Amino acid sequence: MVSEKIKQEVEKLRKEIEYHNYRYYVLAQPVISDEEYDKLMKRLMELEEKYPELKTPDSPTQRVGGQLIEGFETVEHSEPMLSLDNTYNENEIRNFHERIRKVVRDVQYVAELKIDGVSIALRYENGLLVRAITRGDGLRGDDVTANVKTVKSIPLRLPEPLTIEVRGEIFMPVQYFEEFNRQREEEGLLPFANPRNATAGTLHLLDPSQVAQRKLDSFMYYIVKPQQYDLKTQWDALKFLEKLHFKVNPHSKLLSSIEEVIDYWKEWTEKRKKLEYWIDGVVVKVNDFEQQNELGWTAKSPRWAIAFKFPAQQVRTKVLNITFQVGRTGTITPVAEFEPVELEGSIVKRASLHNFDYIKENDIRVGDYVFIEKAGGIIPQISYVLKELRDGDEIETVPPEKCPECGGPVGKESGEYVAYKCLNPHCPAKLKRHIEVFVSRQAMDIQGLGPKIISKIVDAGLVKDIADLYYLNIFDLAQISGLGPKMISNILSEIEKSKQNPIEKLLVGLGIPGVGEKIAKVLAKKYKSMEELSKADIKELSEIEGIGEDIAKNIVEYFNSPKTKEILEKLRKAGVNLESAETTTSNILDGLTFCVTGTLENFSREEIKRFIESLGGHFTDNLTKKTDYLLVGTNPGSKLEKAKKFGVKVLNEQEFLEMLEKKGVELKESWKKPKPKDTLF
C-alpha cells in the first residue's frame, strides 16, 4: 500500500519537472541548474521504480523511451492534412493576394516561418497526449506516439483538461543534425541529406530511447476546429497554443498588407542562416477564420494559404558521365553523374535528365560545366549549361541501341511520347522495378524486400514475375547473401500476410498504367472479384467516374494479356485474395462500436475493420466511453487500461469469435481460435 505522503511527493515532482521542462525547452528561460533538474528526475525515477503502480503515461520519466515498438499503426486523420500551394516570386504572391481580395475585403495575414521538418498531428483527450500521427499521405499517417513523447517541447499533459487536436512540425536543430551526421560518418554510415530526412528517419525508429538521444524539437501552429475554443483568428490560435504550453515560433507576425508579407519574406531570405533550425520559406495565411471558410479549399490545398518559398541556391559542377536507368515499364532514363558538390546541405552526385529530347533541347554533354539547383528545395536538376567554357572535348549523348541492363533491343514510343524503351519483355531491370512497386506500402506492403534484396532475388533467377514471390521458401532465400535466418523468416511472414490484402492493393501492385490507389478502390468497390473485372470492356470501364477511355483501354489490354492470365492463376493457387471485400452481409453487429489494441492472430488491423463493418458494426481507432467493445490481441497498448477506466467491455480474440458463432456467423476454417493461455486476462 502506497502512503498518501509518497503519492503527494510523486505528483509534486512531476509538476515541478514539467514546469522546468516548459521553462527550458519552450521558453528557453531555465530557473534551475542542470544538476538540480537531474536530482528531481532521479528522485522521481526511484519512486516510480519502487512503486510501479504510480507510473502514468504522462509522467516525465516516459520521455526517456521505454520498450521497443513492434511497428507503426496506420491511422486516419480526423481531417485531411493538406499540402500548400507554393510560389517563389513576388508577382505570384501578389496574384495570390488579388485572388483573396476578389472574395473578401479588409484582409490581414499571418506570416510564419516554414520549418523544414516533419508534419505531426497531436491528439489530446482530457488534457493527456493520446496519439501522435505523421502526415503520411494526408489522409492516413503513422502512429508514432511513443517516439513523440520523447520530444521535450511537446507537453504530455496540458495545463487544462481539454480534448483537442493540434498540428505542427517536428524538426532536428542544425547543431544536433551536424553532430549526428559526424557520428554516423565515424561509424561508417551514410550521413542524412538534410534535417528533414533525419527527423523522418528518427520518428520511425523502433527504439524510443534512441529517439530521445537525437534531441528533436517542435513548433505548433494549427488547431483542428478552432471555433470550438472560441478562437476567431490564426493569431488567436497561436496565442492559445502558447497558453497550452506548446512551443510556438516566436518570429510569426501579423501583417496588414501583401507588401508587408513580401518585406517579411525578404528579411528571412537573408536571416535564415542565423537560425538554429532549417527553414525553406514563409507560410502566408489569411488571419480571420470566417474569411478562411469563405475562401475554402481545393482537393489538395487551402485557398487561404500559400508557401512563399526561398529562391533555390545554385552551385557549379561538372558532368562526368551520362548513364542510363531502366524503369518498370522498360523506359530508359538518362542520368547525369556530377563531380560531387554540396547544395543546400546535401552532397549531390547525380540528377535525372528525364529523356533524350530534354538532353537535345538543352544541349547537355559529358564534360560540360553546369549550374545545378534543387527544384522545390528537394530534387537536383541542371538549371544552366556553361557552353562558353567548352574546349571541344565534350561528348554528345545519343540514345542506346541496346538496353543497358539486358542488352535487348531498344525502341522509341510512337506519337508524342519521347521516351526510349527496352523491348525485351524479360528484361530483369523491368522486373526489379515492378517488384519494387508491388511490395511498396501503397500496394501489397511487403516489408523487408528493399531494392538490393529484390535485385539479388531476380539475379539469382528465383522469381520471373511478381507471382513467384509467393512461391519463395526458406531454402530459396538462404541462397541470398546478407540474409540471416531472422530476416528470411520476417520476409516470408510478410509475404504470407500480404495474401489477405484487399484487391485494391493488389490492383495497385499489378502496375496497370493509370491505376493508382484512388482508381483501384473505385474498381474494387464496383467489381466483386478480379475475374469479374477482367471481363469488363472499354465502354463499361470508361463510364466509371474517374476512369477515362485511355485508362479503360489500359485495363482491358492488361487483362487480355496471356501473361496476366498466367500471373493471376499463379496468385490464385498461392492463396492470394482476388475477391473484393464483402459488403454488409448481416446486421448482427448493428449499432455496436469496436476498437482494437495489440496484435490479433487471425486478422490484420485492416482485415478486422472490414470484417466488423461487413457485419454491420462500426470500427474506430479512438477508444472513448461510447465504444462498446475493445478487442485485445497480444502486446496491447494503453487502450486496455483506458477501457477498464471507461467501463468498456473487453474481449480477447477467442471470445470475439465465440460471440459471433453464437450469433450465427459462419467462421472460416482457416481461422484459429487463439488458446486461452495466450490471453492476458
From Swiss-Prot:
Binding site for NAD(+): D34, E35, E36, Y37, D38, S83, L84, E112, R135, E169, K285, K309
Domain called BRCT: residue spans: 584-673
Organism for this UniProt entry: Fervidobacterium nodosum (strain ATCC 35602 / DSM 5306 / Rt17-B1)
Keyword set includes Manganese: yes
One Gene Ontology term, aspect cellular component: cytosol
Protein name: DNA ligase
Catalytic activity: NAD(+) + (deoxyribonucleotide)n-3'-hydroxyl + 5'-phospho-(deoxyribonucleotide)m = (deoxyribonucleotide)n+m + AMP + beta-nicotinamide D-nucleotide
UniProt key word DNA-binding: no
EC top class named in words: ligase
MF term (GO), any: DNA ligase (NAD+) activity
Active site: K114 (n6-amp-lysine intermediate)
Cross-referenced SUPFAM superfamilies: BRCT domain (SSF52113), DNA ligase/mRNA capping enzyme, catalytic domain (SSF56091), Nucleic acid-binding proteins (SSF50249), RuvA domain 2-like (SSF47781)
UniProt record similarity statement: Belongs to the NAD-dependent DNA ligase family. LigA subfamily.
Keyword tags: DNA damage, DNA repair, DNA replication, Ligase, Magnesium, Manganese, Metal-binding, NAD, Zinc
GO biological process, one term: DNA replication
